[in-house]
Amino acid sequence: MNFKNWSLRRLALTVGDHLRRRGVETVLTGGACVSIHSRNRFASFDLDFVLMAAEDRRPGRLALEELGFRKDGRHFRHPDTPYLVEFLLPPVSIGSAPVLHPAEIRSGRRLLKLLSPTDCVKDRLAAYFFWNDRLSLAQALGVAARNAVDFRDIRRWAKSEGMDEKFIHFKKLAADARKTGPEGGAP
């Protein structure tokens, strides 16, 4: 298959749907979700698919090979695209909390399961909370500025992770960003 000049979103939809049609259930996570939910404000060149069952690694590899991807270390590469595909082992979780209800994007008959905007914000905040990653904080703010997110759910999750103070900082920055618009200042 020729993937030249395909967007990350289009490729993610195609790969995710192809895996699903081959019986390999996945959820797209990580930077690809940030890119999709921030409308490409933040670029990512990897598609991290969490397998719903660890035994799906081999069928997943075979499905990717059908599309022309080849295994290269832990990633899969295709000669027509700069995007890499990686399988992560289950469960789909953010910090210690499982992701129970992934979002779905449909395009025609294609279907992609991915982190919801709320879970995508939590995923980025986890890197900020635990490793002080400022880029991840900026990504969380970018996703929150462009999507309806459940701040109560994020607050509950942050509290369960012992990160009340950092959540308060995030919430203040998010409120400031709403005042200045989604392209407002960096954190």
Region spans (language model):
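Compositionally biased terminal segments of proteins
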Residues: M1-P187
